């Protein structure tokens, strides 16, 4: 199966459009009659909306909800449940067979990483975010390798607030460490983000007000008592 490096090698000395890279990879799958298995990291249901609508045309997808950065635990559980609900609703509506896998909640690993690297005071979008992206990409790469997926990737590139160039560069670096192929993407391209908003409305999906990181949330002035109260109220429905 084709690796992104085979395409990227032909694109030296130019800014890389990772959406075009993804589409070239997909075209090769179609020429070869392949339908790969992809383990796709998702930070939240909204980021997985258009991403699944697009990718399920060409591949078998499992959503991997692995986000040790999310605080508090009740908010993690709420986002996980919303993600699981969306996968089920999407499958029922489209006839797809997307799998949902939820990682163990391990916030201590994120906290230790941020403190050990001296990143707790970094602004959102700074070095702490880079380390967080890399940490989660490594988690999904390890799981993809362990469970025999052809590719690993992330739905985070749907967000206009996240640096897709950086995320893809990190993904390619992680690919070089683990023996599993990274699937590059920039899902917000071609009106992907706009389509995600439409799908959130269609599926009545909860859209969170902060990324999840406790350090960024404190600087943002997030009211954790209210977040916890709202999350607990949501979870009591199940």
Swiss-Prot record:
GO terms for biological process: queuosine biosynthetic process; tRNA modification. One of its GO terms (molecular function) is epoxyqueuosine reductase activity. Its EC number is 1.17.99.6. It is an enzyme of class 1 (oxidoreductase). Pathway: tRNA modification; tRNA-queuosine biosynthesis. It catalyses: epoxyqueuosine(34) in tRNA + AH2 = queuosine(34) in tRNA + A + H2O. Pfam families: QueH (PF02677). [4Fe-4S] cluster binds at residues 43-44, 129, 132. It comes from the Bacteria. Keywords: 4Fe-4S, Disulfide bond, Iron, Iron-sulfur, Metal-binding, Oxidoreductase, Queuosine biosynthesis, Redox-active center, tRNA processing. Disulfide bonds join 211-213. Belongs to the QueH family. Catalyzes the conversion of epoxyqueuosine (oQ) to queuosine (Q), which is a hypermodified base found in the wobble positions of tRNA(Asp), tRNA(Asn), tRNA(His) and tRNA(Tyr). This is Epoxyqueuosine reductase QueH. It comes from Staphylococcus epidermidis (strain ATCC 12228 / FDA PCI 1200). The gene is queH.
